[in-house]
């Protein structure tokens, strides 16, 4: 219950940082204003002469007080150093400075508001600083800085408050009760300092629970700049910080604190309310006199300066001990800000929070040279799941993004370089806390019993025992994900199995697999998974198409492709944009059936081409889906074989599975009318899918799209760096005549497949369908009053594309679809998102055609690729497998 309340409080504070900060500052100013203008009008030293108590001030007391102040400042300095180890010393340092300053101001205002004097603040200041515990800020900041986005910052702050809030509250209560005992001592100085201490603890608690989380959330929100796909403030060594913070406080310690609190409450109650009140009254009278509240002792004087000048003079008047203290504070602040950057710049600086991948690779290789061989370490890993944590940390490979190990399973897919194959399972966080596994693998019979036990399962088995069961054929290797408690552990074990069978056991070292949502992959996208392949994603645009602008994501490893397409998009935009139309929409499936004789096949063909036969088949076909609607049948014969090409709309799905289901149902219905018909295959390559085919070029498949644009002569000259005449000439002789001479089918273009494939990979399409989807004819001609403008059109008859199903279910691919505004199914007009995506593909292809044809016409192609598309890595430094074998 308490954790839930603190979580709600943390979420509110992190979600409304401006409101909380402004509210805190406003409350502080209001309390100060009420004291200054509407509070007690008796101000000691300005308009009222307070009693002076003669006290002997020894030089030793001044020295002790100065030493105490210096110790307090050093304590704060070391607290900031520990806080800096979280990552950015600037972000957290500023937040910590805000916390200390606001705590001090709030304590001062509380003291003013309660009408207490400030004469004891000089002595109480060191104790105030010593009571500040920045480990609280450190713990909460760990939660915030382990986030991938601003929304996750809020969630993690709320989660941190739920875990740390009850502990903070209990600690503050115990501190107040313990320090409050000093207020009953009867010693004036001790009572004043203890009173300050209690107020400081309460002020710190208030600020840490409100001002600090709001400040951290606001600072991270304002630091929106990203680097390598992650927030600039996100640091790599926060990979397992949430797992560390999940450890609950020691329950024994918590019980002791609660018992202590109860005892102290009884002590306070007995001393203040139950004991004989007469001593209390005398003490109160003494306190009243000591604080200058007895009007018989005090007397009013005429102020010589204004009130603000009085306060200013008190602030700037300093003794020698105060000068020493401030000098030490200034020197430590300068050292902290300016002279401690070098030691943390490589890993903790905001400018470069993560080491370069190339440097990391070299460091990993160097470290490997100093350790035992990889195979030996792997064997050690298979025989033990509990190894030295230091050794585990030594074998880590630098990640691209921080890995957040969360207690709750989320559907977030983030890209993290996987640990090397030598990383033990304990480093993966796969074993639950409290489960102790044996060092040596147990017998197969015992392991099978544990695996089949509903209360235990695979989490009570080590990786070595799982591998042992796989090798003994008790567990199929392809079922590892379904049998393990997490999909990721199944992938990890499969990698371990595979690495022992490879010629180079460390081959999988840089193939990432960690922190990926495999639940979206299993049974939908891939089998026998050993990881995922990060591919760079660039953006071309804005593409001005049909009056709208699109930023087009392109996943590719070919240099110059995105840059070239981007130039084409710019030329189209400067020319007023492009226009597009979807001419046809229908996915196809072409099964093959066989009849006893060719004449029987001809009879079936004739029946299918009649309205009655088509209506029967359409009814059976349409009954299989609420989206699939049979449009037409294209039937042809080859001897006694009959090829039937079904064409149907499939909504926003690419539709191969949908139309296959309808085709199968229609064939069964057809078999009822012609019992001698034999169904050979639901796909007879008459579709045609993933193969060059004239039928797709002629009849179309998927979406048939045409796109056009007019590029002004000025844009052709200044952006494309060529002339309209040259581009038209090259297009005719290259794209038309050249492709015809090569016998191309649908390849009357410069490089449509480049753009299609890049968009397909980014948007979760079937990359193999670029074969048919890249069918395109690019036409160019001179236009305009002077025939100097360039008219260009691209016609693509077979774009096989969809926005639901398959790879579009993966979150990174969904992100790219969301960039284009076509993610998921269109509720208002089913199929519109897929058609719009096909238009974008065609428009982007036209942009790519423009730029490449201009480069060819101007003779810039080879030059640009020699400059921008050549790797700068020195291959002589990289020894391949063949080199090692030869050596």
UniProtKB/Swiss-Prot annotation:
GO terms for biological process: cholesterol biosynthetic process; coenzyme A metabolic process; isoprenoid biosynthetic process; long-term synaptic potentiation; negative regulation of amyloid-beta clearance; negative regulation of protein catabolic process; negative regulation of protein secretion; regulation of ERK1 and ERK2 cascade. The chain crosses the membrane at residues 10-39, 57-78, 90-114, 124-149, 160-187, 192-220, 249-275, 315-339. Its EC number is 1.1.1.34. Undergoes sterol-mediated ubiquitination and ER-associated degradation (ERAD). Accumulation of sterols in the endoplasmic reticulum (ER) membrane, triggers binding of the reductase to the ER membrane protein INSIG1 or INSIG2. The INSIG1 binding leads to the recruitment of the ubiquitin ligase, AMFR/gp78, RNF139 or RNF145, initiating ubiquitination of the reductase. The ubiquitinated reductase is then extracted from the ER membrane and delivered to cytosolic 26S proteosomes by a mechanism probably mediated by the ATPase Valosin-containing protein VCP/p97. N-glycosylated. Deglycosylated by NGLY1 on release from the endoplasmic reticulum (ER) in a sterol-mediated manner. One of its GO terms (cellular component) is endoplasmic reticulum membrane. It is an enzyme of class 1 (oxidoreductase). Residues 61-218 form the SSD domain. It is found in: Endoplasmic reticulum membrane; Peroxisome membrane. It catalyses: (R)-mevalonate + 2 NADP(+) + CoA = (3S)-3-hydroxy-3-methylglutaryl-CoA + 2 NADPH + 2 H(+). Glycans are attached at residue 281. Pfam families: HMG-CoA_red, Sterol-sensing. Pathway: Metabolic intermediate biosynthesis; (R)-mevalonate biosynthesis; (R)-mevalonate from acetyl-CoA: step 3/3. Residues 40-56, 115-123, 188-191, 276-314 are lumenal. It comes from the Eukaryota. There is a cross-link at residues 89, 248 (Glycyl lysine isopeptide (Lys-Gly) (interchain with G-Cter in ubiquitin)). The active site is at residues 558, 690, 766, 865. A motif (INSIG-binding motif) lies at residues 75-78. It is a multi-pass membrane protein. GO terms for molecular function: coenzyme A binding; GTPase regulator activity; hydroxymethylglutaryl-CoA reductase (NADPH) activity; NADPH binding. InterPro entries: HMG_CoA_Rdtase (IPR002202), HMG_CoA_Rdtase_cat_sf (IPR023074), HMG_CoA_Rdtase_CS (IPR023076), HMG_CoA_Rdtase_eu_arc (IPR004554), HMG_CoA_Rdtase_metazoan (IPR004816), HMG_CoA_Rdtase_N (IPR023282), HMG_CoA_Rdtase_NAD(P)-bd_sf (IPR009023), HMG_CoA_Rdtase_sub-bd_dom_sf (IPR009029). Belongs to the HMG-CoA reductase family. Catalyzes the conversion of (3S)-hydroxy-3-methylglutaryl-CoA (HMG-CoA) to mevalonic acid, the rate-limiting step in the synthesis of cholesterol and other isoprenoids, thus plays a critical role in cellular cholesterol homeostasis. This is 3-hydroxy-3-methylglutaryl-coenzyme A reductase.
């Amino acid at each position: 219950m308490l954790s839930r309340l603190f979580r709600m409080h943390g979420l509110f504070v992190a979600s409304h940082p401006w409101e909380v900060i402004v509210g805190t500052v406003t409350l502080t100013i209001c309390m100060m204003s009420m004291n200054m203008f509407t509070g007690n009008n008796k101000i000691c030293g300005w308009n009222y002469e307070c009693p002076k108590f003669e006290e002997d001030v020894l030089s030793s007391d001044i020295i002790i007080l100065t030493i105490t102040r210096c110790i307090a400042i050093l304590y704060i300095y070391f607290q900031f150093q520990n806080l800096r180890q979280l990552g950015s010393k600037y972000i957290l340092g500023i937040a910590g400075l805000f916390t200390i300053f606001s705590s001090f101001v709030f304590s001062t205002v509380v003291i003013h508001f309660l009408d207490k004097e400030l004469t004891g603040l000089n002595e109480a200041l060191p104790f105030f600083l010593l009571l500040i515990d920045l480990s609280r800020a450190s713990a909460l900041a760990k939660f915030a800085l382990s986030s991938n986005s601003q929304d996750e910052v809020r969630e993690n702050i709320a989660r941190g408050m739920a875990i740390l809030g009850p502990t903070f509250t209990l600690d503050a209560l115990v501190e107040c009760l313990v320090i409050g005992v000093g207020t009953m001592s009867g010693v004036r100085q001790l009572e004043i300092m203890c009173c300050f201490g209690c107020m400081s603890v309460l002020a710190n608690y208030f600020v840490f629970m409100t001002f600090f989380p709001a400040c951290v959330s606001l600072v991270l929100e304002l630091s929106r700049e990203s680097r390598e796909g992650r927030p600039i403030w996100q640091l790599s060594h926060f990979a397992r910080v949430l797992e560390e913070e999940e450890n609950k406080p020691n329950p024994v310690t918590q019980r002791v604190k609660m018992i202590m609190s109860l005892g102290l409450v009884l002590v306070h109650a007995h001393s203040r309310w139950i004991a004989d009140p007469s001593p209390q009254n005398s003490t109160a009278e003494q306190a009243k006199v000591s604080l200058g509240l007895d009007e018989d002792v005090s007397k009013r004087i005429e102020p010589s300066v204004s009130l603000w000048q009085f306060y200013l003079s008190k602030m700037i008047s300093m003794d020698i001990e105060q000068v020493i203290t401030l000098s030490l504070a200034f020197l430590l602040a300068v050292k902290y800000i300016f002279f401690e950057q070098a030691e943390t710049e490589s890993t903790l600086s905001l400018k470069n929070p993560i080491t370069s991948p190339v440097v990391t690779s070299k460091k990993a290789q160097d470290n490997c040279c100093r350790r035992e061989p990889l195979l030996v370490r792997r064997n050690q890993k298979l025989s033990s799941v509990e190894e030295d944590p230091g050794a585990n940390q030594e074998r880590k490979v630098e990640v691209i993004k921080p890995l957040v190990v969360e207690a709750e399973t989320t559907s977030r897919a983030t890209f993290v370089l996987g640990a090397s194959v030598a990383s033990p399972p304990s480093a993966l966080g796969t074993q639950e806390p409290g489960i102790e596994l044996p060092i040596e693998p147990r017998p197969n019979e015992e392991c099978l019993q544990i695996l089949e036990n509903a209360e235990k399962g695979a989490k009570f088995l080590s990786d070595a025992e799982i591998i042992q069961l796989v090798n003994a054929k008790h567990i199929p290797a392809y079922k590892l994900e379904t049998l393990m408690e997490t999909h990721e552990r199944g992938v990890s074990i499969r990698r371990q199995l595979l690495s022992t069978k490879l010629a180079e056991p460390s081959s999988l070292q840089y193939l990432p697999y960690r922190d990926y949502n495999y639940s979206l992959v299993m049974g939908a996208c891939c089998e026998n998974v050993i990881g995922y392949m990060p591919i760079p994603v660039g953006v071309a645009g804005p593409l001005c198409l049909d009056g709208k602008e699109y930023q087009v994501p392109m996943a590719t490893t070919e240099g110059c492709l995105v840059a070239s397409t981007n130039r084409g998009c710019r030329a189209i935009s400067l020319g007023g944009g492009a226009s597009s139309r979807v001419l046809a929409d229908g996915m196809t499936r072409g099964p093959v059936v066989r009849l006893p004789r060719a004449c029987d096949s001809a009879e079936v063909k004739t029946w299918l081409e009649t309205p009655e036969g088509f209506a029967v088949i359409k009814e059976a076909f349409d009954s299989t889906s609420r989206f699939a609607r049979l449009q037409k049948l294209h039937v042809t014969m080859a001897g006694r074989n009959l090829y039937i090409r079904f064409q149907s709309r499939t909504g926003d799905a690419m539709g191969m599975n949908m139309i296959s289901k309808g085709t199968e149902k229609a064939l069964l219905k057809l078999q009822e009318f012609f019992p001698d018909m034999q169904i050979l295959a639901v796909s007879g390559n008459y579709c045609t899918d993933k193969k060059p085919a004239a039928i797709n070029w002629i009849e179309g498949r998927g979406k048939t799209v045409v796109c056009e644009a007019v590029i002004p002569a000025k844009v052709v000259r200044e952006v494309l760096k060529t002339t309209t005449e040259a581009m038209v000439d090259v297009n005719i002789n290259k794209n038309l005549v050249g492709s015809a001479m090569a016998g191309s089918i649908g390849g009357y273009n410069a490089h449509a497949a480049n753009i299609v494939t890049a968009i397909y990979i980014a948007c979760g399409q079937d990359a193999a369908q670029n074969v048919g989807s890249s069918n395109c004819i690019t036409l160019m001609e001179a236009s305009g009053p002077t025939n100097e403008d360039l008219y260009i059109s691209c016609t693509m008859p077979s774009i096989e594309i969809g926005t639901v199903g398959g790879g579009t279910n993966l979150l990174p691919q969904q992100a790219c679809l969301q960039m284009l505004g076509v993610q998921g199914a269109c509720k208002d007009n089913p199929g519109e998102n897929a058609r719009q995506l096909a238009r974008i593909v065609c428009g982007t292809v036209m942009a790519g055609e423009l730029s490449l044809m201009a480069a060819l016409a101007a003779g810039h192609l080879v030059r640009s690729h020699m400059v921008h598309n050549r790797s700068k890595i020195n291959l002589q430094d990289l020894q391949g497998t063949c080199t090692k074998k030869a050596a």
